[in-house]
């Protein structure tokens, strides 16, 4: 009888322990920092929760530059558990500061080699590539007799004076990939000379990478230097836009994922990072991006220019990350006078 009672008690105790541990894990909240487009956050969390309903994502979202600055400021007292959707150049900077937890997620071998940190184990893994593009409002261009630009150099022609908006690279990852890629395409001296000439035609600099294209879509400017995802999405919504891939080539960066060093929720963080490189996740990224971490899964994206993979420059991410501070300081000194007020 004692054995039976002991067995019952043990079973009940085990069930309680299991229930409590399951409830505790079920209550796991992950603080996830991101620069993913705000409209996609609900979808990303919902798809993840289809497979892992026991982990709740609490998003902290802003533009790439602002999220990067926030993470660096919190280095000694990190508040994020995971970074899901931030520029690889930003993560390389944090890797150098010892801020990322090295982890080889399940399925790593299935990723394109460009979409992972070179360290073993890696500190970050890539999701998709976002690429520079020029968003041209055809109605506004016709109204102002503006020819459709086909190159970056075209944007320096006097005819475009006051009709161009682009992102401030101190706030925007898209702005930084533009600036760092121009310095690679044209060379250091040529890149700054190009930006000096472009600055003459800039109406204003924004603090968001998508905003110049959104403004072009609404007819607030004729031309927005932005990224292809936003142009394609605006065009699909009926905006009178052309998405132009400049002939010199385009800068690009990866949206990438990493675990923040020191998280107290490491198991849940690993679960999210594992999921972020699955085929299911990559198919989700492909709903908006033409180039993804598992490229064999990629299907054409509506209104994306066909020549994007060929136009992507051989971007030196290590160089961009190590020179980021210098580049941003120089840009700020030269051009910040035309930046919009920060909201």
Annotated model-derived regions:
Residues 188-190, 293-343:
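An extracytoplasmic/periplasmic, membrane-proximal ligand-sensing/linker region
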